[in-house]
Amino acid sequence: MGEPRSAQLRIDRPGLSCLQDLGRQEGSRIGQMTGGALDQYSAAMANTLVASPSEAPLIELVAHDFAATTDTDLLIAVTGADADVTIDGRPQQQWEPILWPAGSQLAITRIRAGLRVYLGVHGSVRAPHLLGSCAPDTVLGFGAVFAAGEVCHVEVDCPTISQPWFGLPFFRLGARPHHFAGHWDIPITDGPDIAEFGSTVDRLHGHDYVVGPSSNHIGLRLGRTDQGPIPHRQTRTEVLSRGVPIGAVEVPAGDEILILHRGRGVTAGYPVLAVVTTVGLSRLGQARPGDTVRFRPVSTATAIADLRRQQAHLHDVGTRVRTAFTSLASLNSPTRSPLSAPQLQSPTDHRTVGEPHELH
């Protein structure tokens, strides 16, 4: 698309930020933590919106304010939790590509109605890899949060783009965000040990649960909002340690249930009552301590259909992005006549480059 350029992002205010990707998809086969972005959908969408592979490295922010300065014009996208996004004080939109001019500061503040924000950058973000992924592994001590003044390097092949109208997004591509409301509808399928819980299974399906303060990337601890009893096993046989999937809803002794997330070990010895679907896991990746959760039983077929719809939407957005980038390549081609080049919309037109007609 253009001559490669090297960009440097200086981290001015790191908060809790790190390099992240979608994780080690084959890690469980060799006993390795899968890791990766807890909100896989938002991370994949951030990369898709800037025409990067969905599994490419990006920056993940957790809860705290973040700021960085670039020395090169960049195309970026900010997805995930609701936040205030500004470039040199000018408000910017989430879930759309943003032009980040050289010498300006990007600030992402007041992260709310969700926990994690993802910053995708068009180009190749340099990152150390372990078993094919840059995802941090806290057990092995791989990966670390950014420090103030640290520099993140990006190789960019996108041509320099001029966008004089900061009040409008350069593209409007119709990416659908999560519904952030502090109350999460989480679909689950039956776990391998559900029969051992008898009628107490209804204590999971029919009540609201609250996310506990000790929840993290390894798993979420939840208790009932009314402090009522949780499901319990009706049998007394010993449970041997065995492989458990990401999303396993375990029931240890006590008054909390445990949902294993992407930082979990590959084996565990608690009974597995249910398994959160892939779509539900991305939602749980945004659940804050104090948020409430309602579990909704679904069939395996429904869980697969939900995931396919989400993947189809990512594919549709990717197609729109490729169309927009093809137009940009034509616009910047020295062999194309200026009279036949695509024209940018004027500031009075509420549609922008790349916006499908059905979205306006």
Q: At which residue positions do the language-model features occur?
A:
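Conserved "landmark" site that anchors the functional core of diverse proteins
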Residues: 1-360
